[in-house]
Amino acid sequence: MGLCHSNCPFVEQKCHRIKVSRPTEGGVWPTTNGFSLDHTTKSAKTLGRTRTTSPKTNERGMNLGSSGGTSTSGHTSSGYSSGNAPGTSSSSTGGGATSSEMPAEIRPKVVTVKHPESNKPKPTTKKGKAIQADVDVIKEFQRCKEENILRLDLSKSSITVIPPSVKDCTSLIEFYLYGNKISSLPVEIGCLSNLKTLALNENSLTSLPDSLQNLKALKVLDLRHNKLSEIPDVIYKLHTLTTLYLRFNRIKVVGDNLKNLSSLTMLSLRENKIHELPAAIGHLRNLTTLDLSHNHLKHLPEAIGNCVNLTALDLQHNDLLDIPETIGNLANLQRLGLRYNQLTAIPVSLRNCIHMDEFNVEGNSISQLPDGLLASLSNLTTITLSRNAFHSYPSGGPAQFTNVTSINMEHNQIDKIQYGIFSRAKGLTKLNMKENALTSLPLDIGTWSQMVELNFGTNSLAKLPDDIHCLQNLEILILSNNMLKRIPNTIGNLKKLRVLDLEENRLESLPSEIGLLHDLQKLILQSNALQSLPRTIGHLTNLTYLSVGENNLQYLPEEIGTLENLESLYINDNASLVKLPYELALCQNLAIMSIENCPLSALPPEVVGGGPSLVIQYLKLHSPYRQM
């Protein structure tokens, strides 16, 4: 049956610009992050929190714009989107203002309702009197009985107790109680004989009543984010279940009675403490989605191969030492998550899983793949082998990359890209070879005509092939932390280039042709040996970020004033930089500037000591362009 999610609240997040004293590495595309098979949003506990500080006015690296706004930590509701567990949020926990007419000792608790059209909780009152939470629940049950309601949503209503009168709601087909403070369920819950969907996620349940087995029609049971230390025995008696969510509990053991749930098509045991999976898993032959990620599994039972209808199997972030050969029986498999385990090898039988479109084994200890494995998986579009122990590309030749659009080999020990390895990869647009041992690039690099993103950062490259100018579709080029002494003049032919990262090389100069990169938005030259910048840099009118700190610059060209879109400028740690051009004040969009450890002796000491804002003001005041 369809799962309603129209009332799922969205939590507004705010952010504001912060001062950065050193540029961060930019332009590097992130490695593939795998996938979550139950498609749920992250809880507030798992979301990163952003901590910001207001810029100091007396620092020499600072935000030139006005500071404002506040930082809010990420938070999402557990409402459902397409493919998620059931349930929608129509109310949120809150304690709005109580009626001033009531004595404090008898003031009822206020329930706030979050309306779909607004992010602001609104107190619900009737005739000036706040509704008591428990009384409200009882009234809802009474209404359910009288009107034969089919769907009842009491999510996020600060409910702590479900009253026995729930037994009267026998007409219910969908019952949503997620996001409350319920620690136990009454036995009367077993009277809801027509119930098909029961959402109890984000509560404090430690057990379930045996009467739950009376729910003979139950299809979907959501118990995510509770406090279950084991799978309650009564769950194994719910033979009609097709979808079971047990994510983020404290479950350590999965019992053999799991075999009783033969109707399951979706099972999520993600983020528990499971060390072993019973062979009984093989009885769940209707399973299409199985999420066992973020547990402590070291091995899988051979019986996993009996789950022949699986299309998605997520095993990432476990302690797996091996994968059974029976994995090859899962001929319908489309997504297989193996990231961050302890695998040293991949079974040959995986070549039978020809419907897979992504192969991701990031964060293991694999040094080689079975011969021809990738070539057999002809539908692959994304290959991620990053953070392993590869010394060379997988054997299989050009055929293994025929339909691939993205390859990530970051953080391995590869010292060579074979000539012609991508000769059949006509759709390859992204290649990440960051943190390897490359000393040179293949002579046929000019044939990679569809390439959009190249990352060769943190290798040992001493030069770039002149043919790099043939990559007419290239938009992002990362060459940071290499040993480059020069950039070929042909760099100017990369007309679509938006990001060029040359940080931490040995460059003493830049070709004037760099000014031909009219689409360039981010240019990173930090930590080189540059003594000057070409005047043609003024032609980069789309540039928003320029980092030339930690060089040997003696001056900045006057043409820098034509960079009308420049927002961030880092010129820190240039020991010979004694003055700045007045034209710098023409960069009206400049918001962040770093001048730490630059003498700037041509400027008054009190101006330099006042930081970038005062420096810019001084340049404006004394500039011959001040009337402009």
From Swiss-Prot:
Residues 23-130 are annotated as: Disordered. LRR repeats lie at residues 148-169, 171-192, 194-216, 217-238, 240-262, 263-284, 286-307, 309-330, 332-353, 355-376, 379-400, 403-424, 427-448, 450-471, 473-494, 496-517, 519-540, 542-563, 565-587, 589-610. Gene3D superfamilies: Ribonuclease Inhibitor. The keyword Repeat applies. Keywords: Leucine-rich repeat, Repeat. Pfam families: LRR_14, LRR_8. Residues 69-92 have a biased composition (Low complexity). SMART domains: LRR_BAC, LRR_SD22, LRR_TYP. Residues 104-120 have a biased composition (Basic and acidic residues). It comes from the Eukaryota. Belongs to the SHOC2 family. Acts as a Ras effector and participates in MAPK pathway activation. Probably acts as a regulatory subunit of protein phosphatase that specifically dephosphorylates Raf kinase and stimulate Raf activity at specialized signaling complexes upon Ras activation. This is Leucine-rich repeat protein soc-2 homolog. It comes from Culex quinquefasciatus (Southern house mosquito).
